[in-house]
Amino acid sequence: MCGIFGFILSKPLSMKEVFAVLKKLEVSKYPDEEFPVGGYGAGIAIMFADGDVRIEKVGKTADSPAGELEEIVKNASIMNAGLSNAKVLLGHVRNPSPGNMGTAKFKEAAQPFVGHFEQQLTVVSVHNGTVENWKDLRADLKEHVFESEKAGSFIDSEVIPHYFGEILLEQEDVDGAAYELLDTLEGSNAAALLQIDEENAFLHLIYKGKPRGLTVWANNKGEVIFCSRPEPVEKELESLLLSRKFKEKISISHQEDAGLKLTFRVPT
């Protein structure tokens, strides 16, 4: 299992604050859990105002992967000031299943994953859980190229943006497409997906089974924050939650079996 974090904000959040959350999230471990949420890779996807997306990620490192990624992004921001903060972001910390532990050192096996499609459609996702029917879904995506295969082992999470993109090409109903994805995925899964095309952008949150929890905060300004665990956000972004009057919209505990689909429009 892994951990996911992200947001849609009207004012940018600094990368220092982003990585403060991710570093807390990757070591999060409740007393009844055997392993922490992360520690074997980390990644972020930043969506810019023009709809372009920049992804940065690392595999397992000697110390904190989120800390290592923070340094990479900090150095990159010297050349690109747009990487110093973000209004729309997906974040991920990785703890792979035993069968995929051999891929931990490869950044290609870390998330976010992305799929590019016709009609200038892009889907970016971060995922926590296990897609039990990934082989069946992978078989329906024969023409697709998958980044994780460069690490020598296909990562089940990568079917999600590719499969969702194909659903979107077949139907115009955004909500219906997200529900279809939720229904199709077998196993315990939590995912956040950015759907971006020429005219619109949406953030979808889906949750099914027991993938270790999800908390969502929202306010009346259309802003949203989500995280697998509430503590990293409440600790590191307390002033933001208070000043912008965020309220807890959804709270699913790490032991709870639940189903959820939320869709938010991303201002473009």
Label every PLM stretch briefly.
Residues 1-268:
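Conserved short alpha-helical segments that host acidic/polar catalytic motifs at enzyme active sites
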